[in-house]
């Protein structure tokens, strides 16, 4: 009896795929989706950093959830960390110590989780800044801007709740200084709201279990839903792109999803995981065993939150002790910190609609803008970054005063003055800088690139020769070119005058034949790009509405 032949796995999968396609016909739609094109600019990877960091957060968070006990019940520590043996603490702090010292890989996963949270929030901030300065939030992508703003706000509070759960001295001070004091200061409902959150006076016995539920269930679920909606909108509305040869408001130039984009994304995800793994293994963060358990009677100097909440801490430190009285109710200074936070969040979410309202720009935009081309928006963004940086530095005014031997009162007043003066000064400087860059671009398009060659005229005058970027007239003068919204070359080496580096590895050059083939391929690609640019310019010139709208 002959043995049965083992079926080939490829044939089995092919037959199953054929059966599925004959029933549900997904092949046409799947082929169309896999043929989607994505642009390849490096700045588009910032959003992927946030996405992959969130995936790492989910995986490490699930692992930590298996061992963390969010109870605030008092226990006596008898673990392996000798300096804290016999010390009374909460179960939350005890379980965090056990994760750090007794669970296999616990400290490694804890630190990866914390670093991933910082990278997630930082990536969202930088990603939003890129979208803001390039105008990617304009119609029809206002909804994605709102989603990104909500993701940043949720990430800030998710991180705040996360590092508050271990119940160490630093996290307890943060809860007392921010959540408890601000809540108590709210008029009319402050006391009732504080009792609802803490179950009585601070610190109570129910806050950490509630933060735990928010941190591992509610907020991550909302973030996951918003990320899914964000990706769906990007997929449906197509990705924005920078202006360039062959790129218009109605197409996308880049690489297809399969195989190039998928393989690049997979490699980038592996790189993010590797970097976070190295950070978690070599860079210590939040060593709670050095801080000890939280005691309401103890307060440590030099206490600051993570960077994304430091601006709120700085605002609380430098805000004057102003109290207002309405209907026999006192509104203390900490409440105004919460009011300003809410105002900042509202301005962040509604900015696309405010810009559209004041500029009257209701057109659809798929091409991005260079920051210099929109000086008002760029100046507003620089002003906001300056405001954030001043408040962040104000959050460490005690450390600055200690290290530089400055009066703490002086650092407070420096922060107050800087919060008002520096953003306005940066706005003016940025605006003038953008105007200067615009004039520099127009000068090159009109006269050409400076060559550094000085020529003496017959009557004795000296001039510098310029290399025209386009055709010249009968007298040899360059014909001014129209600005296309892309980078303008300012040096001769940008035109290839300095030659190109030799191809090959670090030690050995490529063979002559291979080097010649690579040069020929580069030349063909440049000619193809120039041809596409000429066709695009001709189509604009022949179109009655071809002139680009100005913002």
Curated annotation (Swiss-Prot):
Alphabetical list of InterPro entries matching this protein: Cyt_b/b6_N (IPR005797), Cytb/b6-like_sf (IPR027387), Di-haem_cyt_TM (IPR016174)
| Gene3D superfamilies assigned to the protein according to its UniProt record, in alphabetical order | Cytochrome Bc1 Complex, Chain C (1.20.810.10)
Identify its protein family.
Belongs to the cytochrome b family.
Q: Which cofactor does it need?
A: heme
- Kindly report the protein's main subcellular placement as a broad class: membrane
How does the cofactor bind to this protein, according to its record? Answer: Binds 2 heme groups non-covalently per subunit.
* Subcellular location, record wording: Cell membrane
Query: Mind telling me which PROSITE patterns this protein's record contains?
Result: CYTB_NTER
* An individual GO BP term: respiratory electron transport chain
What's the protein called, per UniProt? Cytochrome bc1 complex cytochrome b subunit
Stretches the record annotates as Disordered: 532-551
Q: What class of enzyme is it?
A: translocase
Protein residues bound to heme 1: 113, 215
For this protein, the record's PANTHER family field holds: CYTOCHROME B (PTHR19271:SF16)
List, alphabetically, the Pfam families matched. Answer: Cytochrom_B_N_2 (PF13631)
**What exactly does this protein do?**
Cytochrome b subunit of the cytochrome bc1 complex, an essential component of the respiratory electron transport chain required for ATP synthesis. The bc1 complex catalyzes the oxidation of ubiquinol and the reduction of cytochrome c in the respiratory chain. The bc1 complex operates through a Q-cycle mechanism that couples electron transfer to generation of the proton gradient that drives ATP synthesis. The cytochrome b subunit contains two ubiquinol reactive sites: the oxidation (QP) site and the reduction (QN) site.
**Positions of transmembrane segments:** 44-64, 117-137, 145-165, 188-208, 216-236, 265-285, 334-354, 380-400, 417-437
Asked if the record carries the keyword Metal-binding, the reply is yes
What SUPFAM superfamilies has UniProt attached to this entry? Transmembrane di-heme cytochromes
* Any one of the GO CC terms: plasma membrane
Q: What is its EC number?
A: 7.1.1.8
Catalytic activity entry: a quinol + 2 Fe(III)-[cytochrome c](out) = a quinone + 2 Fe(II)-[cytochrome c](out) + 2 H(+)(out)
- Corresponding gene? qcrB
Keywords in alphabetical order, please.
Answer: Cell membrane, Electron transport, Heme, Iron, Membrane, Metal-binding, Respiratory chain, Translocase, Transmembrane, Transmembrane helix, Transport
Q: Which residues of the sequence carry a binding annotation for heme 2?
A: 127, 230
Single Gene Ontology MF annotation: ubiquinol-cytochrome-c reductase activity
Q: How does it sit in the membrane?
A: Multi-pass membrane protein
């Amino acid at each position: 009896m002959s043995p049965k032949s083992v079926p080939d796995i490829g044939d089995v999968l092919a037959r199953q795929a054929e059966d599925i396609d004959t029933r549900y016909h997904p092949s046409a739609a799947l082929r169309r989706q896999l043929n989607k094109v994505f642009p390849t600019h490096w700045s588009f990877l910032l959003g992927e950093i946030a996405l992959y960091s969130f995936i790492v957060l989910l995986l490490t968070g699930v692992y930590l959830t298996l061992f963390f006990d969010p109870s605030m019940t008092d226990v006596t520590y008898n673990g392996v960390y000798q300096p804290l043996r016999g010390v009374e603490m909460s179960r939350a702090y005890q379980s965090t110590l056990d994760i750090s010292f007794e669970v296999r890989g616990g400290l490694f996963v804890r630190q990866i989780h914390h670093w991933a949270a910082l990278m997630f929030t930082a990536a969202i901030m930088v990603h939003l800044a890129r979208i803001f300065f390039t105008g990617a939030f304009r119609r029809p992508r206002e909804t994605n801007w709102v989603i990104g703003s909500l993701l940043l706000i949720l990430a800030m509070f998710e991180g705040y709740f996360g590092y508050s759960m271990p119940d160490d001295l630093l996290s307890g001070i943060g809860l007392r200084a921010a959540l408890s004091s601000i809540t108590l200061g709210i008029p009319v409902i402050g006391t009732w709201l504080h009792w609802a959150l803490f179950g009585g006076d601070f610190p109570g016995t129910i806050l950490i279990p509630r933060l735990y539920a928010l941190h591992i269930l509610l907020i991550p679920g909302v973030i996951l839903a918003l990320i899914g909606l964000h990706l769906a909108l990007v997929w449906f509305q197509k990705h924005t792109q920078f202006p360039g040869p062959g790129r218009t408001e109605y197409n996308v130039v880049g690489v297809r999803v399969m195989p190039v984009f998928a393989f690049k994304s997979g490699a980038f995800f592996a790189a993010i995981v590797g970097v976070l793994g190295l950070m978690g293994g070599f860079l210590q963060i939040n060593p709670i065993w050095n801080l000890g358990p939280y005691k309401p009677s103890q307060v440590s100097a030099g206490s600051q939150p993570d960077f994304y909440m430091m601006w709120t801490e700085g605002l609380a430190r430098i805000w004057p002790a102003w109290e207002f009285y309405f209907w026999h109710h006192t509104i203390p200074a900490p409440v105004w910190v919460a009011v300003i936070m809410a105002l900042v969040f509202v301005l962040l979410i509604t900015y696309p609609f405010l810009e559209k309202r004041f500029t009257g720009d209701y057109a659809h935009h798929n091409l991005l803008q260079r920051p210099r081309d929109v000086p008002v928006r760029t100046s507003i963004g620089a002003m906001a970054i300056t405001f954030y940086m001043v408040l962040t530095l104000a959050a460490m005014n005690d450390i600055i005063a200690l290290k530089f031997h400055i009066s703490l009162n002086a650092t407070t007043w420096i922060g107050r003055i800087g919060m008002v003066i520096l953003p306005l000064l940066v706005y003016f400087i940025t605006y003038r800088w953008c105007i200067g860059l615009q004039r520099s671009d127009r000068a090159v398009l009109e006269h050409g690139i400076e060559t550094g060659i000085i020529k003496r005229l017959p009557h004795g005058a000296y001039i510098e020769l310029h290399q025209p970027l386009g055709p010249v007239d009968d007298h040899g003068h360059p014909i001014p070119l129209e600005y296309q919204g892309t980078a303008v070359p300012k040096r001769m080496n940008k035109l290839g005058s300095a030659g190109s580096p030799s191809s090959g590895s670090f030690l050995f050059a490529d063979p002559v034949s291979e080097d010649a083939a690579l040069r020929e391929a580069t030349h063909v690609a440049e000619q193809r790009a120039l041809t596409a640019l000429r066709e695009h310019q001709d189509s604009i010139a022949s179109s009655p509405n071809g002139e680009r709208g100005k913002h």
